[in-house]
Amino acid sequence: MEDLKKPFKLEGIQRIDETPVHKAVREGFINLIIHSDYLMDSGVLKVIKYSDGFEFTNPGILKLPLEEIYRGGNSKSRNPHMQTMLRMVGFGDNVGSGFPTILDAWDKEGWVKPELIEDTILNQVTLVLKMSKEAKEEKTNFAQKNERSFDKKRF
């Protein structure tokens, strides 16, 4: 995370160099740890840093529906003791607030909405955090170009 931009901000005489993006990436990493299924033989925790984002993959499937995760407010941790321990040392927010924290940070930057992908065949979950506006604009342009054709089709 060292190459993420850090603004110069002072609170009194102390420099504050953590941004909502830093907090969101850390939250993604914490979620990777507390929601992993460590009993799976084939599973491995994986973090990939790209020039334009991050990808976090952990073994196990989601314990809540995607819609509920995106909405926030609920958590069903696979490793609640680990979650409690991390919160006690200052990592992680209130239960159920982590994913909305990520969504808010990305929305404020105008970046592509974070994508949570559940692969039930490989039994793994991947969080994709793209730090770009491109895909968002491409989707918008595609929708605008095809708006009329979508309106005409009735299913």
Describe the predicted segments one by one:
Residues 1-155:
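C-terminal regulatory or interaction extensions
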